[in-house]
Amino acid sequence: MSGGRFDFDDGGAYCGGWEGGKAHGHGLCTGPKGQGEYSGSWNFGFEVAGVYTWPSGNTFEGYWSQGKRHGLGIETKGRWLYKGEWTHGFKGRYGIRQSTNSGAKYEGTWNNGLQDGYGTETYADGGTYQGQFTNGMRHGYGVRQSVPYGMAVVVRSPLRTSLSSLRSEHSNGTVAPDSPAADGPMLPSPPVPRGGFALTLLATAEAARPQGLFTRGTLLGRLRRSESRTSLGSQRSRLSFLKSELSSGASDAASTGSLAEGAEGPDDAAAPFDADIDATTTETYMGEWKNDKRSGFGVSERSSGLRYEGEWLDNLRHGYGRTTLPDGHREEGKYRHNVLVKGTKRRVLPLKSSKVRQKVEHGVEGAQRAAAIARQKAEIAASRTSHAKAKAEAAEQAALAANQESNIARTLAKELAPDFYQPGPEYQKRRLLQEILENSESLLEPPERGLGTGLPERPRESPQLHERETPQPEGGPPSPAGTPPQPKRPRPGASKDGLLSPGSWNGEPGGEGSRPATPSDGAGRRSPARPASEHMAIEALQPPPAPSQEPEVAMYRGYHSYAVRTGPPEPPPLEDEQEPEPEPEPEVRRSDSAPPSPVSATVPEEEPPAPRSPVPAKQATLEPKPIVPKAEPKAKARKTEARGLSKAGAKKKGRKEVAQAKEAEVEVEEVPNTVLICMVILLNIGLAILFVHLLT
């Protein structure tokens, strides 16, 4: 057998013995670009026993087969340690995975690298779960046993993934909180949940129900469903107890807070009962599990005597069941998200009450049957656990043998190539230093966080802070000249704050965008639009112009962007002085000249066609009454001119009166229509509620 050093094209290298052109005997090999290292024994190009070290510092010590971990071995990955069997690169069939920082561990069977079959989970506080697993989750039948309440871990945040979580690595250390059921409301959680405890003080069913349009004081509000009204209603024990938990608290594996989905009522309602729990009280759940949650039939009981037997859904009492209180009283019926919605005590409808009682009995029988099966599965899990412990001890012996082979390979590599770089020890040193830094940071983090959040202290030069602040002044950016809605927005307060200038929209007179001191292309693009926007904005706020002597020009200026003459030529000034009409006419002209300022910005665009000039002539049918007496005292020589002016004034007044009449009709019609619609909607809702209450 010969030996030496061989460098690969991908940057890796091998230093050790070989035979037949393949690695054989003992040797050390690095991966592509020198990343990763294996040191140990080889068999014609394949690893046999040794130690593989990743650049992160994670290691595997054990046996290999066909280039994959196979047999017995120990994997150190982050803060987790796996000892047991390996099958073609995956954990299993029997093994133990435990946390190096806490007492959390799993002992049992595995499949494809996940907990599968039967096993025992032990959590950081000492609580346990024995039963079935599927794809890394508690699924099937099992028994969850908590530690005394005073020793149970306190869950402070549903988003926090504890080191005791055995399934947290599959979600990269972060676990999303359990979403509430689709038909259940989001409700506040109790203040201090404990791992493994699902029994918590809750509010009454009335407090948990969403408040509708009709309260208890109304006629429809007095229609109630049949529910328990016995002595439980006057006692503190009447309140619902069973509550969702973190799939078994932060002490459970990769479980997150379903606490936000279950508690009815305010947080302070839960405090009295939590304070009354004895520190030695324990809790046990025996029954079905689905997707890592209590779902199906099951029994949950406390050492104090509190007990629930019935159906569960997502760690909540959901279905038919019975709650037995420590004083012997019972609360039974149909539960919905931990709240009793149908009881059997009030016998308003005897037939319906008997059906509910039958379903409750069926739920209790199913829960007792599920509890018996769960105890059997727990016994099987205990036997699997003992077998996994034996495999873990054998894996420790295999790791010792692998380390011996690794030391031999390193010694041989130094002899064959003294200058050969061995990255494995360096990786492990980095990992140790990183752990020391993380531990020191964990000790310093709480006081830093207690002082305050870091976001307000971010410097003003930070681009993120700058981006957060700039959208506020840019809420109304200057628009192109062809968009009239922009000058309309600031119109009500423009006279006070002068917000119509293009620069004022950005908060600075000469700036564009969020960086006024830096010229940008966007500013150059917007500059051509400034004159148009300024003209439109200022035109809307100009004082009314002097009354013109030609009403036709003022009227049709709303339809055209220029003055259009439709009446006869202007009479000489002497004629205007002799006519008695100039006094009432300016009033009409002034009243008409004021509204065109806002209307002129919209009417010309919405109704641009000019042929509307002959249309108003047909509408002037009701006007001769006020105009005829004014035209009588005029001289006959100027009847033609006076008639032209009177007709124009009549047309103008007619249009104004018709427009005012239409606006009045619209306002009169809108109010009763809205009221009627609201009344009809409320009536329909009331009838629907009445119908539902009568049916239920």
Swiss-Prot record:
Swiss-Prot/TrEMBL MORN repeat ranges: 14-36, 38-59, 60-79, 82-104, 106-128, 129-151, 285-307, 308-330
Gene3D superfamilies recorded: Histone H3 K4-specific methyltransferase SET7/9 N-terminal domain
Residues exposed to the Cytoplasmic side: 1-674
Biased composition (Basic and acidic residues): 457-471, 631-644
Extent of motif Bipartite nuclear localization signal: 345-359
Residues covered by region (Disordered): 164-192, 246-273, 439-664
UniProt motif Nuclear localization signal: location: 488-492
Keywords: Cell membrane, Developmental protein, DNA-binding, Endoplasmic reticulum, Membrane, Nucleus, Phosphoprotein, Repeat, Repressor, Sarcoplasmic reticulum, Transcription, Transcription regulation, Transmembrane, Transmembrane helix
UniProt xrefs under SUPFAM superfamilies: Histone H3 K4-specific methyltransferase SET7/9 N-terminal domain
PTM (free text): Proteolytically cleaved by calpain in response to cardiac stress. The major cleavage site takes place at the C-terminus and leads to the release of the Junctophilin-2 N-terminal fragment chain (JP2NT). Phosphorylation on Ser-165, probably by PKC, affects RYR1-mediated calcium ion release, interaction with TRPC3, and skeletal muscle myotubule development.
One GO term describing the cellular component: sarcoplasmic reticulum
An example Gene Ontology biological process: regulation of cardiac muscle tissue development
Spans traversing the lipid bilayer: 675-695
Bias (Pro residues) ranges: 474-487
InterPro entries assigned to the protein according to its UniProt record, in alphabetical order: Junctophilin (IPR017191), MORN (IPR003409)
Domain of life: Eukaryota
Tissue: Abundantly expressed in skeletal muscle and heart. Weak expression in stomach and lung.
Phosphoserine, modified sites: 162, 165, 440, 442, 462, 479, 527, 533, 593, 597, 613
Phenotype upon loss of function: Null mice possess cardiomyocytes with deficiencies in the junctional membrane complexes and have abnormal Ca(2+) transients. Mice die from cardiac arrest at 10.5 dpc.
Start-end of Acidic residues biased regions: 573-585
One Pfam family cited in the UniProt record for this chain: MORN
Keyword Metal-binding recorded: no
Site (Cleavage): residue numbering on this chain: 155-156, 201-202, 565-566
Family designation: Belongs to the junctophilin family.
Protein name as catalogued: Junctophilin-2
Organism: Mus musculus
